[in-house]
Amino acid sequence: MGMTIAEKIFAAHLVDEPFHGTRVLKLDVVMCHEITTPIAIADLIARGKDRVFDTSRIKAVIDHVTPSKDSKTATQAKMLRDWARRHNIKDFFDIGANGVCHALFPEKGFIRPGYTVIMGDSHTCTHGAFGAFAAGVGTTDLEVGILKGVCAFREPKTIRINLNGKLPKGVYAKDAILHVIGRLGVNGATDRVIEFRGAVVDAMTMESRMTLCNMAIEAGGTSGICMPDSVTVDYLWPFISEDYASKEAALVEFKKWWSDEDAVYERVLDLDISGLEPVVTFGYKPDQVKTITEMAGTPVDQVYLGSCTNGRLEDLRVAAEILKGKKIAPTVRAILSPATPKVYSDALHEGLIDIFMEAGFCVTNPTCGACLGMSNGVLAEGEVCASTTNRNFMGRMGKGGMVHLMSPATSAATAIEGKMADPRKYL
């Protein structure tokens, strides 16, 4: 019987099987940020186990509230900073070098096909775009990962999603994943790996694949995952060129992780994306989705462009194409948070930041801030935000606030009109 990519990764990293259905895996990368990691650090210190299993395999960043907004967040940042210095963790990104973790770490080439990756953050599934098994974990698992370099997981069952056809004009990876979540439901992939396949995925950039995998958790998925291919090789080549004689040789190695033709899936869902319209959410769950045609005209107070879902250069380019030479509506405020310093710098050099500022956007430093209602764009009670983030839970971006999830293109069109708008008219 053949194996899925997730099963192959599990088999290659298996350390122990303490009881049926549970696998203890060796970890390739443990990622840390200043919100969840300090809790693990404090407990390790209290237990007299302030150690790390391998400093080269730990990556840490201050990203959620940066710069710190108050004493509490400053203390959290200091705990992570002091810990990283104490253990000589070289891949630690402090103020000035920091960015949103799930954009920054791939940008640094830290994730490779076949890797096992954990973090105390639910959107760690983003890194599955590289053909890795990447999952968010709780504090106890994070502690064990930091200390021992292992983590326990349930035996993986995989749901395969075949995205067939071709993305229409004005429709992007964000629309595709919202459509998938709408079909699966918020619990439809609980404790499952979602394997994204098909012509649509094959044609996507790594940035778009990261958008897909980023929101696997919104359907309950432990991880999202894509097959590593020539697109993956091209993205990683600056970091792996010394390890392989050629890109072709790297691709041969990467293909060893591909799911076998006779792999067994718990479920296979075929979706033709060719006729898909831009998609937006309408309620307080990510599976509550409608087309922009159904939602057009809904007024908003704020537009937010950024996050680990859609704060990459590709996303900024899409939005800037629509915004160029235009102004945002006087009834809205618009905020752009580039996901990393490199994204910010590249956008500056391409003239994209000028386009956003001339349109009326406020441009912030790289941060998660507004996405989870912590800083740099928090909503007031009763306000509505058109957002490129990944969660629309009640109060997610501010107590009593309403969030509608959408693509960067739809958010840009919405900013221009001050109400939900179809981006296709501007393309």
From Swiss-Prot:
It is an enzyme of class 4 (lyase). It comes from Geotalea uraniireducens (strain Rf4) (Geobacter uraniireducens). This is 3-isopropylmalate dehydratase large subunit. GO terms for biological process: L-leucine biosynthetic process. It comes from the Bacteria. Catalyzes the isomerization between 2-isopropylmalate and 3-isopropylmalate, via the formation of 2-isopropylmaleate. Belongs to the aconitase/IPM isomerase family. LeuC type 2 subfamily. Its cofactor is [4Fe-4S] cluster. It catalyses: (2R,3S)-3-isopropylmalate = (2S)-2-isopropylmalate. Its EC number is 4.2.1.33. Heterodimer of LeuC and LeuD. One of its GO terms (molecular function) is metal ion binding. Pfam families: Aconitase. Keywords: 4Fe-4S, Amino-acid biosynthesis, Branched-chain amino acid biosynthesis, Iron, Iron-sulfur, Leucine biosynthesis, Lyase, Metal-binding. [4Fe-4S] cluster binds at residues 308, 368, 371. Pathway: Amino-acid biosynthesis; L-leucine biosynthesis; L-leucine from 3-methyl-2-oxobutanoate: step 2/4. HAMAP family: LeuC_type2. Disulfide bonds: none annotated. Binds 1 [4Fe-4S] cluster per subunit.
